[in-house]
Amino acid sequence: VARPLWLIDLDNTLYDASWRVMGEINRRMTAFMADRLRLSEQQASHLRERYWRRYGATLLGLMRHHEINPYEFLYQTHPHHDLHHFVPASRGARYRVSRLAGERWLLTNASRRYALKLLQLLGLKRCFDRVIAIEDMKISGRFRPKPSMLLMRRLLRQSGRPAGRIRLIDDHDENLQAAHRLGMRTARVLASKTVRMQARDSGRPLAARRPSYVRLQVHCLRSLIRAQHFR
């Protein structure tokens, strides 16, 4: 029987990115778009979110509608040299991730440079057998980040495993839905306290609902470890 393969998201899954880093990335994206597209800050922020919701990544909307250079965008908007200012201390993260039995691939729509630096800061670089960042998500010359079904099918082929031996760990419903449609096992990790509080305040607490495409729902990696043999 093939060992399980874990496809693990980065921000708001491995750690609580809402602490500071996601706000900083969004701020830099908004500033970049305001400058390049000659928009007000409010217009740029609205467009950033609209592209993210429509395409799964703001970058795809900018490439499709404005011919933005993807590598320049990623370089300008993802912290690197100063990333340590925006990432909370993560005690025991290496121990917890290493206890997930099987092969582990990091799967993130963020840039490779950002992902590798963040793994280093979290002490998780040696915990992953492979890192798949947005630069690695080109198919037939076009970027196909999560939740692209083309990407998910390619990962399934590359894994050499039946879909039932692959487990996607993510915080976004669209990504979990795509994996579920292919027969992969899915777990939603609600690591962001900010997101949980916003959902609770809106009257729709995340913990109170588990969609059919989510096999397991937990608040942290520690809980995932205890339930890692979910089916």
Predicted feature descriptions by range:
Residues 92-101:
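Catalytic-core regions built around general acid/base machinery
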Residues 39, 68, 102, 161, ...:
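Short glycine/serine/threonine/alanine-rich loop segments
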Residues 2-8, 13-92, 113:
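N-terminal helical cap/lid subdomain that shapes the substrate entry/recognition surface
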Residues 108-110:
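Conserved phosphate-coupling serine/threonine residues in phosphotransfer and NTP-handling enzymes
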Residues 83, 104-105, 141-145:
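Short, surface-exposed loop/turn motifs that are enriched in glycine and acidic residues
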